[in-house]
Amino acid sequence: TAIRKCNPRT
């Protein structure tokens, strides 16, 4: 899961 990479606001 690369949440920070795809959605830096998260």
UniProtKB/Swiss-Prot annotation:
Primary location group: secreted
Entry GO MF terms: toxin activity
Gene Ontology CC: extracellular region
Originating species: Tityus obscurus (Amazonian scorpion)
Tissues/organs with expression: Expressed by the venom gland.
KW Lyase (keyword) present: no
SS bond partners: none
Annotated compartments: Secreted
Positions in coiled-coil regions: none
Protein name from the UniProt record: Toxin To37
Keywords: Secreted, Toxin
